[in-house]
Design a protein with these regions (language model features):
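Extended basic (Lys/Arg/His-rich) segments that typically form rRNA-contacting surfaces
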Residues: 27-380
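N-terminal chloroplast transit peptides
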Residues: 1-23
Length: 380
């Protein structure tokens, strides 16, 4: 009888433990992890751009001579950017021909990922269609873009910048824009551009690319990387508005302006739940820092392009203030990418020889060209 009671108690205990392990009540005191939305810790691959001012007894005349030498070597009026400014370190012409050889027989596929470009937002300007409809466009200029580094997929998976939700068949390509004098940056930052053989860039960013779309370091990227009537995704940091309340940040209605009570006109009200939902839930719309977050506008159509000045006119609005850096890349929307199957883009990019043969300005078939006659009257 005693052994039967022991077996029954052991069986009952195992059942209770099994039910307790599957029941959510054991997490009744669980606290959600709180973390900062904006981390102050720099990325692990971050290199300091500037260092302390070290003169080492150099006179002002010597500094002027160094600046003049930098200007003559890299920023001459006849050649704004020279690829021979810095000698390539660890990358010869034979290695470029073998490792970064462009496969001319490769055809663009639906899941192919090309590199993007860094542009500067110049503002907005209206355009008109042939039917007379007004369309607001954002003007983006692609200035001095060069490929700085390419990391193959097998090496990119081992890096600290790789995330588990990335595809294992993508590599990393670093693109820089706006060449500057090397006297403005630290030595560690200047060493990042030795492999590409270009002047130090003011802005760097990273794109995920397919192995078939890899480009050699030092390759120049222009606005003709895209085409008119293509759809692109544009991402940038939104305009910062500092600390704002719920009315401006989230669009709360607020209380009555005439019969409000005290200082509760623009307050958020209750922040907690009921009896069973005590405490503030994650994601509650509250007052806080507004703006300065990365935002992406997807599926923007290119209506006009100036190949001479590398200017792109995209339909719609783009996040960020004027004169900010934006990332322009091929769209990820499936219903927009299906149209590229009939007319695929150039992979990995449009070569410099082919870019010189393009017309200076290309407009969409829907836009009206103001150089043409709007009204034609036949003589009677």
């Amino acid at each position: 009888m005693a052994s039967l009671i022991c077996k029954f108690s052991g069986c009952l205990q195992s059942i209770l433990l099994r039910e307790a392990s599957c029941c959510s009540r054991i997490l009744i005191n669980h606290e959600h992890k709180r973390y900062r939305k904006r981390s102050r810790k720099p990325a692990p691959w971050f290199e300091p751009r500037k260092t302390g001012k070290l003169t080492y007894g150099v006179t002002d005349e010597n500094v002027a001579d160094l600046k003049q030498q930098v200007w003559e070597d890299s920023f001459k009026p006849d050649s704004p950017i020279r690829a021979e400014f810095l000698e390539r370190k660890g990358l010869t012409d034979n290695m470029i021909a073998s490792q970064y050889q462009v496969d001319k027989n490769f055809k663009w596929k639906f899941n192919t990922k090309r590199t993007g470009v860094i542009a500067i937002k110049l503002g907005m300007i209206p355009q008109w269609t042939k039917e007379g409809e007004k369309v607001m466009c954002t003007v983006l200029q692609v200035l001095d873009n060069h490929v700085i580094r390419y990391t193959p997929p097998e090496d990119f998976q081992k890096s600290q910048g790789f995330h588990p939700w990335f595809s294992k068949n993508v590599g990393s390509m670093v693109v820089g824009t706006l060449s500057c004098s090397p006297l403005l940056f630290s030595k560690r930052y200047n060493n990042l551009f030795l492999e590409a053989g270009v002047a130090p860039k003011r802005k760097l960013t990273r794109f995920l690319v397919s192995p078939e779309c890899k480009l050699a370091p030092g390759t120049k990227l222009r606005a003709c990387h895209f085409r008119v009537d293509d759809y692109v995704d544009v991402s940038a940091k939104t305009i910062g508005h500092a600390f704002q309340g719920v009315v401006k940040r989230w669009g709360f209605k607020g209380q009555s302006a005439t019969h409000r009570g005290g200082k509760s006109w623009r307050r958020a009200g209750a922040t907690g739940g009921g009896r069973s939902q005590a405490g503030t839930r994650r994601g509650k719309k509250m007052a806080g820092h507004m703006g300065m977050d990365w935002n992406t506008q997807k599926g923007l159509k290119i209506l006009r392009m100036d190949n001479k000045y590398d200017v792109i006119y995209v339909k719609g609005v783009v996040p960020g203030p004027d004169h900010c850096y934006v990332r322009v890349m091929d769209t990820v929307l499936n219903h927009r990418r299906k149209g590229l199957m009939k007319n695929p883009p150039s992979c990995p990019t449009l070569l410099e020889d082919s870019a010189q043969k393009l017309p200076s300005e290309v407009l969409s078939s829907d836009l009206f060209d103001f150089r043409d006659d709007s009204i034609s009257i036949s003589a009677e």
